[in-house]
Amino acid sequence: MSSPPQGSSLASPVQAAAVTGDKTTLLKLIASSPEVIDQEDQLGRTPLMYSVLGDRRSCAEALLKHGAQVNHPDRSGRTALHLAAQTGNHRLLKLLLSRKADCTHRDLRDITAVHLSTRHQDTRCLALILKYTPPGQVDAQDQRKQTALHWSAYYNRPRHVRLLVRHGSNIGIPDTEGKIPLHWAAGHKDPEAALTVRCLLEAAPTESLLNWQDYEGRTPLHLAVGDGNQEVVRLLTSYRGCNVAPYDNLFRTPLHWAALLGYTPIAHLLLETNNSPNIPSDSQGATPLHYAAQGNCPDTVRVLLSHISVRDEADLEGRTAFMWAAGKGSDEVVRTMLELDPELEVNRTDKYGGTALHAASLSGQITTVRILLENRVQVDAVDVMKHTALFRACEMGHREVISTLIKGGAKVHLVDKDGRSPLHWAALGGNANVCQILIENNINPDAQDYEGRTPLQCAAYGGYIGCMEVLMENKADPNIQDKNGRTALHWSCNNGYLDAVKLLLGYSAFPNQMENTEERYTPLDYALLGGHQEVIQFMLEHGALSIAAIQDIAASKIQAVYKGHKVRRAFQERKNLLMKHEQLRKGAAAKKREGENRQKGKVGQTEGKQKDENHVMRQDKSNEHIQNEVMREWYGEETGRAEDRKEEHQEENQNIEPKQLKHSKHMEQNSKSIAKNQKRAGHIQSSPIEHVHTNSIQTRMSPSRTSISHSSPLGNETPKNMYWDDNPTQNNTQPRRTSRPQIESPNIIVHRIEDLVQKESRRKSHREERKGSHRQRASSHHRLQASERETAGSVIHGEVEFKKKETKKGRRTAAGTSKIRASGEAGRLSQSEKEFSSTGIQGRVDCITSPESCETPSRVCRERKMISAKSGQRPLTETQSPEKACQGSSALKPSLTSHTKQTAIASKCLDSTPSYIGFGEAIKPLTPMGILREGSFSSKWQNIDIELIPLEARLQLVEKEKARKQLFQRKKHAATVIQKAWRTYCIRKSSRKTRHSHLRNNPRAMV
C-alpha cells in the first residue's frame, strides 16, 4: 500500500467527513481513492485522529475496518490513543486498545497515555490503560522525569494515586527538581490536598519521605507553608518524624517563610510544635522577625515577639528587625515594636553606622521618618561615610523627606568623608527640585569637595540639564576647575552631552580651559577622544581649540620672546666684554707705568754705580800709570805705549769680568753704596752680593761685547816681545800679552820712580783733559745702554709676569713659606732675565752693525748659542764658549763703525722685537694681527701678553667661540625636544585608549 500524500489541507474531504461523522461520504471517498484513508494534514493528523477528537465512533470503526493505521503518530509524536486518553473518551480508548494500540508509545516529550489519563477525574481510562500496560511500564518517566504518580499528585487526584499505588507505582522517584510526589501533593493550595498527602503517607509513612529535600533543600513542609495550606501543615507536623525547622539552601526554615508571607496561624502552629529554644537565622543572619517586620505583618510580629525564644537580633550587616521595618516603610510594625518595647534603641547603628532614620530616608518613607522624628531619633547621626539621613534623601531625590528632615533640625552645611555636601549628591542624582530646596536653605552652589569638584561638575557629568540650569541660575561658576584642572565643560564634552555644552557656553563657560595633567587636554580634546561629532562641530563654531593648536600659538610667542631675550643677552655679554677689556686695558696701563717707574729707578741706580766704578778706576789708573812710566824707562818708549794701550783695554774689560779685576774690594764697597741708594728709592731687589753676581752673569753672557772690548788696539800687529798664555780658568778667551823684563839694580829703579813721580805731576793736567773726553763718550754709551735695557725690559715684562702667574697657580696648595720662597725666586728670575735680555740685545746689536763680525763664524755661533739658551736649552758653559766652538775660523776683525753709531742702528732695529728673537726674525717682525690672520698662534707668541692683541681681534675670537657653543647647544636642545615629543606622543596614544574604554565601561568613574 502506497503511503498517503503529505501536507494535505485541513479542509480535505476525508478529514472533514471523519470529524463531522459523515460515514457515507467517508466510505465513498475511501472507495474512490483508498490512499486517502491515512492522509495527513499540516499537523500530521490522520482521519482516524479526527474521528477520535470528534468522538465519532462509527467513523473510527469504518476507518479501522478499511485498514487505517492505529499507531500512526502526528507531528508531535502522539497517536490516536494519546488523544483518546487526553480527552477521556473511554469508548474510543477501548476500541483502539482492542485494535492493538500501543499504550507505551511516547510522544516527543516522552509522555505516554498513562500520564495523560491522570488529568481527568474519571479513573476508568487509567484503569483500562493500566490493564494493557506491561508491569514495568507503570512508572514511565517523561522528559521531566515525572511518572504518572507525579501527575496524579500535581492534579490532586487521590483516587488515581491509590490506583497507581495499587499497581505498584514507586512514591519515592524524584523528578528533575528533586521532588517526589509528596512534594507536589503538599504544595497544592486546595485544602483537599491533605487527602492526597494522606494517601501517599499511608502507602509509606517513613521519616525519609516526610523530610525529603528537593534540589533547593525544601521539604514537603516548606512547600505546604509556602502555599499557606494550614491543613497540610497540620497533617505533616502531626507525624513524629517530621522536622519542624529544616533548613533549605538559603538556611531558611518553614517559620521564615511563614513570617515572610504573613501566615500568622501557620507561624503560631510552627512555634508551638518547635521544641528548640532558639530561633535560627538564615544565610543573611535574618530571623523570622526580620521577615515579618519587612512584610509589614504586625500580627505575625506580635506573635513572634510574644514567644519567649524570639528576640530582635541583628543580621550579618548589623541591622535589626526595627531597621528592616523602617527601610520598607512598615509603619504598623514600627508602631507595634515601639509599643511592645518602650526602651527600644531607635538610634542603634548597623555595621556601616546607619540608623533606622538612614534606612527610611534612603527609601523615601516619609511617614516612617515622621514617626522616627517623634521618637527621639538623632537627625544628624552620621555613618562611616559621614552621611546623615539628609545625604541619603538628597541622593535619591525625596523632596518631602528632605523638607521634613530640614524642619526636624537637619544641617545642610555638613560634608561627608570626600568633602561632598548634600548639594553634590543631589546634583549627581539629577534632582533639580532638591537642588532648589537646598539652595533656598543657604547652601553654597560653588562648594567644592576634596577633589575640587563642584555640584555643577557633578550634574554635567550626568548631563542633567535641569539641575545645571538651577545651579547656574543661582550664580554657580561654570569655570571652576578641580584638582586636575577640569571644568564642567570637560565632563559634558567627554560624555557627549550637546545640550549641556550649549547651556554651559550660554553661561559664559571658557571653551579653551586646559587641565593640569601632563596631556593638558581642553574640552575639545575630550570631545575628539570620544568621537562626539555634534559636540566637536559646536565647539569649533564657538572658538574652541585643541591642545595642539594652543601649543602652536604659544610656541610662536615663546620664540618671539626668546629671540628678544637672546638679543638682550648678547648685548649684555658684549657690554660685559667691553667693560672687561677696559678694565684689562687700565690694569695693563697701570702695570706699564709701574714698570717704567721701576726701570727709571734701576737706571738711576746703574748711573750711580757707574760713577762709583769710574772713581775707583781713575784711582787705579793713576797707580798703574806710574808703573807704566817706570816700565817705559826700563824697556823703551814703544813698550810703554803698548802698555798704555793695554791699560785702556783692561779698563774696558773691568765691566765684563769682575772676577779678574784687581780692585774687587773697591767693587764691593761700590755695591754697598748702590744698595743704600736703592733702599732709599724703595726698589731693593737683592743683596749687594747678588748685584755683583748679576753683573758677572751679564758680562759672561754677552759674547759680542766681550769680543769688541778684547779687540786689539794695535790691529793685527803683535809685538815681538808678546807670547800667548792660555788660562782655562779665566773667562776671557783672547790671548794675553806678557813681556819678559830684564833685571836691573834697585837703586836705578828708585831714582827712576822719583823722576816719574815728578813727570806725573806735570802730565796730570794733560791726562785729565784726555780722560774728560773719554768720560763724555762713556756717559753717552751708558745712556744708550740704559735705553736699550728699558726697551728690552718692556717687551719681556709681559712674559715674565705670565710666568709668575703660572708659577703661583701651580703652587696654590703649597705651604706659606714655600710661597714666599717661590715669589722671591721668581723676583730674582725676573731681574736676571731682564739683565740677560739687555745683554743679549747689546750682543746682537754689535753683530748687526759690524759687517765683518756678521760674516765671522764665531759671531754666528755665539748668536745661535744665545738663542738656544733663551729658548730653554742648556746655556753655554765656560768650556763651551762661542770662541772655542769656532776655533777653526779666522781671527776677529776690528769694528769699522763707532759704538754710538752701532747702538743707534740697534735701537732702531729692536724697537718692537722681543729679546729672544734672532737676527732673521728681527728683520721681518711678526705682528699679532698677522698671527690672527694665519689662524693659529706661533709657539713663540703663545706667552705674549693679551694687551698686545688688538681689541677687534679679541672680539672676533670671542664671537667665533660663542657661535660654536650656541650651535652645539641648539643641536642638543633640538634632539632633547624631539625625544620628549616622541615619548609624550606614545604615552598619549596609549592613555587615550585606556581612558576612553574606562569611561565607557564605568560611567560613574568620576564619583
Curated annotation (Swiss-Prot):
ANK repeats lie at residues 9-39, 43-72, 76-105, 109-140, 144-173, 177-209, 216-246, 250-279, 284-313, 317-346, 352-381, 385-414, 418-447, 451-480, 484-513, 519-549. It comes from the Eukaryota. Residues 702-712 have a biased composition (Low complexity). A motif (D-box 2) lies at residues 964-972. InterPro entries: Ankyrin_rpt (IPR002110), Ankyrin_rpt-contain_sf (IPR036770), IQ_motif_EF-hand-BS (IPR000048). Keywords: ANK repeat, Calmodulin-binding, Cytoplasm, Cytoskeleton, Developmental protein, Repeat, Wnt signaling pathway. Pfam families: Ank, Ank_2, IQ. One of its GO terms (cellular component) is cytoplasm. Residues 684-701, 727-745, 870-893 have a biased composition (Polar residues). Transmembrane segments: none annotated. One of its GO terms (molecular function) is calmodulin binding. It is found in: Cytoplasm; Cytoplasm, Cytoskeleton. Residues 772-784 have a biased composition (Basic residues). PANTHER family: ANK_REP_REGION DOMAIN-CONTAINING PROTEIN-RELATED, ANKYRIN REPEAT DOMAIN 44. This is Inversin-A. It comes from Xenopus laevis (African clawed frog).
